[in-house]
Amino acid sequence: MKVRPSVKPMCEHCKIIKRHGRVMVICSANPKHKQRQG
């Protein structure tokens, strides 16, 4: 999980979601692409 000031999709499998008021990126193809804003 990367914590970044700005989260962007890294590939076509990345999805931007909002959990508990935090913007996150989840990726089914590559788990390294997981990101959280903060």
Curated annotation (Swiss-Prot):
Q: Identify a single GO molecular function assigned to this protein.
A: structural constituent of ribosome
Q: Which key words are in the record?
A: Ribonucleoprotein, Ribosomal protein
Q: Which GO terms describe its cellular component?
A: cytoplasm; ribonucleoprotein complex; ribosome
Q: What is a single Pfam family found in this protein's UniProt entry?
A: Ribosomal_L36
Domain of life of the organism in this record? Bacteria
Q: Which GO terms describe its biological process?
A: translation
Q: Which family does it belong to?
A: Belongs to the bacterial ribosomal protein bL36 family.
Query: PANTHER family this protein is in?
Result: 50S RIBOSOMAL PROTEIN L36, CHLOROPLASTIC, LARGE RIBOSOMAL SUBUNIT PROTEIN BL36C
Q: What is this protein called?
A: Large ribosomal subunit protein bL36
- Give the source species: Lactobacillus gasseri (strain ATCC 33323 / DSM 20243 / BCRC 14619 / CIP 102991 / JCM 1131 / KCTC 3163 / NCIMB 11718 / NCTC 13722 / AM63)
Q: What is the lineage of its organism?
A: Bacteria, Bacillati, Bacillota, Bacilli, Lactobacillales
Gene, per the UniProt record: rpmJ
